[in-house]
Amino acid sequence: MPDGELRHYNYGEQADAGSFYLSSRDHGLTWRKVNSPRDMPQADVASRVSGEYVRLVNMWADGVYCIRTQGGPKGNRTVTKVDSIGSIMIKPPVFARDGKLMIVAAHGGEKGCYTYVSDDDGLTWQRSNTVVTPPHTGGGFHKGIRWNHGAVEPTVVELTDGRLWMLMRTPHDKHYEAFSEDGGLTWSEPRQSRFYGTITMPTIGRLKDGRLIFFWCNTTPLPELATANGVWDDVFTNRDVTHVAISDDDGKTWRGFRELMLDPMRNESDYALRGGGIDRGMHQAQFVEPEPGKIVAAIGQHPLHRAIVAFDTDWLYETERTDDFSDSLRNWTTFNYIKGIKGHCSYNRINGVELKAHPDRKGQNVLSLRYDKADSLVSDIRGAVWNFPALRQGEFTASIRLPEGAEGHTMVLNDRWMNPCDTVARYEGIYILPLSRKELGIKDDRWHTLTVEWDVDRPSDKAIVRVDGRRRKIKLPMSNPTADGISYVHFLAEPGENDSLPAPLFIERVAAKQRQPR
């Protein structure tokens, strides 16, 4: 609002009862509930030209309408028909050409997305061509076909060269992108973008100082089951975390790739049904920048999963992170799915690992990771996934103990979140290291410091492995290319030889930091 107030409106598919909004006057740190008339403008955007507030709304069979104030929020409003066909997930207006163009992204109809464009401050509108992406066809690790909903939930930003950039949700492994050179009236053929993300909504925007910021789920779901026929999604398995990245050069390079928030319900045995069997998880985000570099974001679906989060963009430039389990498993993804789809496209979960008291240090915990056979689970492979700032040249260190009989453990360095139980990570990860005594040259039950050093800008140079500072003969090839560096470690625990139940791998501390290019 002009006086600095932030408002978060209560409306839409999962709105609480009543007509109200949340108000903050301290840049999103504290909020209070304010009751409001039902006919009050909601989450409208102020025109840079006139200051009037504008919003496009879907009236389903009646089509799309523009609601525009006359004299600001307390004045009158005009309602103008924009389209005779309804649209879904209509986004707030984006301004281009120094505010002279309003662009509103939406989707509907032909399993595609498009934009509405106004060059007269929201009085009249034109609709662009429809952007359509190819269907998911299965194959590879998939036994079925992902929900082929087409290109939907687009997000748009103006680039410094005048083009508009659209990123969209699709059923593929990565978000697709398209570009417009005429202010959003026509869009190019879509292509795969650099950003991983499947059946989740992206959000991009420009900050006050010109930087771009991107919110999305940098995640890959489990391979599709044979029951998935492409008509509807049977279960969502990649909506447990929202990520953020930032660009200083108009989208050419990106930094961060940080987990903004992990779903606090992610390990719950009644995950699928608690609070009602409706959409849930951490996908979908909106943001504002009340002060330069200070971001307030609303993320997630479902009252028990969504949250308002405030952060400083400096956090996205950090180049190291550590964890010693002093916060328990707060920063880790460790769940397994229980068989049986419940509620709206969900599985219930269990925590697939254990925290145990450190045998040598009072008050400290260690992670115990071992395979444990369980027919009740979608997959009984156990895993632990941890995020750190994306590093093109980096070093990952873990203090580990491999007791006699520890088998079936693998460490994957990756550029995205994958399910803890997903062994596809061994094939699609960037660097893969078997964690065996023989491989690492470990001959006792003591704690050892394992280090891996990499440089993704020199793919012919294999990653170096050290144990207790001593370089091992083993070198890790780059198994797959990465656009933005390594930002995840993924520990896997699979059955031992002859399907035996092996001893656990113990982890007491992990750390990642940037290295200088070689």
Predicted features along the sequence, with ranges:
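Flexible glycan-contacting loops in extracellular carbohydrate-active proteins
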Residues: 474-508
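Extracellular beta-strand elements of beta-rich domains used
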Residues: 325, 505-512
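Extracellular glycan-recognition surfaces and repeat-rich motifs
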Residues: 330-369
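Asp-box/BNR beta-propeller blade signature and adjacent active/binding-site loops
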Residues: 1-329, 338-341, 352-355, 373-375, ...
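Short, aromatic/His-centered strand-loop micro-motif at the edge of beta-sheets
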Residues: 429-451
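Beta-strand-rich interaction surfaces with strong enrichment in secreted/lumenal proteins
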Residues: 191, 382-388, 435-442, 478, ...
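Short tryptophan-centered beta-strand motifs in secreted/extracellular beta-sheet-rich domains
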Residues: 398, 446-457, 463-465
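Secretory/extracellular carbohydrate-interaction modules
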Residues: 362-436
